[in-house]
Amino acid sequence: MKKIRIVILCASAMSSGIIVESIKKEAPLIGVDCYVECAASIRYRDYDYNKVDVIMIAPQIKMYKSQILPFLKERGFDKIPVVDINMRDYGLAHGKPILLAAIKAMEEGNND
């Protein structure tokens, strides 16, 4: 079974909680052991990225990506893929395509 650890950075870690639950529901259906949690973007500097495979950016904080990426690089976490969550999937709480995007980024090791 494929394993993945995801953190979703969002504005206040409230709406992304719905996404987290959707991802947790979908993961076993596609054979993925998934640990996923959300964190408020204001705390991105305090988060422990040591056990994260993919960082996902919620649509409402996309503008902070230009601050988050340099921070990750200076802390040595620039090899962790950072993925923008599709706005439509986020708004409709479609966990499966969000999870698939995270898996693809982890496998390819890319930052979009």
What residues fall within each predicted segment?
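Non-catalytic signal-transmission and effector/linker regions of two-component phosphorelay proteins
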Residues: M1-K2, N110
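Conserved active-site segments centered on acidic
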Residues: K3-R43
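Gly/Ser/Thr-rich loops at beta-strand to alpha-helix junctions
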Residues: A11-G17, I61-M63, Y90-G91
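Residues at alpha-helix caps and immediate loop-helix transition turns in enzyme cores, especially N-
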Residues: I19, Q67-I68, H94-G95
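Short, well-ordered alpha-helices that flank and scaffold nucleotide-derived cofactor binding pockets
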Residues: E21, K25, L29, P70, ...
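Structural motif
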Residues: R43-Y49, L92-G95
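Mid-chain, well-packed structural core segment of small domains
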Residues: D48-R88
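Ser/Thr/Gly-rich flexible loops in soluble cytosolic domains mediating phosphotransfer, phosphorylation
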Residues: F77-D112
